[in-house]
Amino acid sequence: MVSSWPPRKCGIATFAEEAAEFIKKKDEQRPFYVVSHTDGEGDNVFPIIDMSRRDWYEPVAKKIQELDPYAVHIQHEYGLYNYVDENGDSDQNQGFLELLKRLGGLATIVEPHTVHGRLREHEENFVHEMTSLATVVLFKCHYQKWRLGWNFASRGWELPANIMIVPHGARPDKKYAIDEVAALEDELGLSYLKGKHVIGLVGWIQSNKRWDILTSIWEELHDRIKARTGEEWVLLAAGEMRDPNHTKDYVRYVNGIEHLAEKDIAYFHKFIPRGDPYYKVMAVCDLIVLPSLDETQSGTLARIIALNKPFVTTAPLEGLTAQTLESGGGLLFTNRDMLKKQILRLATDESMRWGLGYKLYRYLMEVVSWEVVAGQYYTAYHAAIEEKESGTPVYFEPEF
C-alpha cells in the first residue's frame, strides 16, 4: 500500500491503517508492505515519500518494483502528493502521475479520497489521466461515477471503464452496549456526563466542520428539549486541531463551547480522535451532529456508522448525503431552522433513535463493514492482475 501512515495526524493515514488491518486478515499468509511519507512508522513500513523532492516518485517506484508486489494499492489525496517548488508553484500532482507511469507493468489500484461531483478543470485533467494510467480506480460513492460521466462528456471524453465502487469501510467490532457507557465515561474522564443524555460533536476540529452552527443554537435547543421531555441533555464537543491553518476557527469554535460550559449545558473534551478513544468518546453519545460544509466522504461518518449512532448532517453534500440516504440512519439539514427541527425530533423521540440505529447496524453489516470492503478490495486486485496477465482491459458496468 502507498499512503500516508501513522503517527501522522491525517485522515488518510488513519483510514489506511484500518484498511490494512482487514486486508491482511483476508489473506494472512501474504506479506503486506507500506510505502509511506517520511514520517510513517511501523513494521514493514518504508517511509521514503519525500515531498521536498520534485522527483519523489523515483525512489518510490524503485522500492515498489524491488518488492515485486501482488498488487499496488495507492491511497490518493491531492495534498499528500502536492510538490511545491521554491517559487511556491504546485505541480498539480504531476509527480503522482509519473509514479503511475513507472509502475505501468504492475497491477495498480488507486483509491482517490476526493472526487467532487462538480470537478474543477485541473481535477478533471488529473482524474482523466489518472484513470488512464491506473489498472483499477476505486470510487467511494455511486454518484461520483455517474457524475464523472456527465463531467467528462462535456470535454468529449468517455467514462473510464475501470472504475469500481467500494464504499468507505467501517469497523464491525466497535459497538458498545448501553450498560457499558458508565464505565467508558469513567475511563475517559467524562464522569460528569453520567445521568445525562449527550449530543456529540466529535472528531478533528477543522474550518469545514462548522461546530459554531450548533453551538450558536444549543442553548435554545437545550431549553426546548428539557421543556418537552424533562430530560437533561448536554452537548459534548470533543476533538483536537490537526492543521494550524485552522487555528482561527478552532479558537472560535472552542470559545463557543466554553461559553456554553459556563452554563453547565456543554463540555469540551480535548483528545486525539484516532484509534479506540475515537470510538469510545462517540459511544457515550446518544446522537451525533456532523455539520460539515465541504466533504466528499467522511471518516467521522464511518465511525458513526460503526457505532450505530443516529446522526444529523448537512445536505446536499456529496458522500455525506449519499450515505445518509443509502443507510436510512440519519437526518439531513440545509439551514439552522431545519437543524433545530431535526435535533428536536431525535432528542425527543427515543424510538426514532433506536430505529435509525438499527438501520445503521444493517447498513454496516451488509454494505460498509471492513470485512465486506476487504473482500471488494481483493475483487479489485484480482481484476487488475487479470488485466495484466491477459491483456484484456477491466470493465465495470456504468451506474446508469
What are these regions (language model features)?
Residues 191-209, 215-218, 236:
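Conserved donor-binding/catalytic core segment of Leloir-type glycosyltransferases
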Residues 132-182:
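Donor nucleotide-sugar binding/catalytic pocket of nucleotide-sugar-dependent glycosyltransferases
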Residues 175-192, 253:
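A short helix/loop element that forms part of the nucleotide-sugar donor recognition site in Leloir-type
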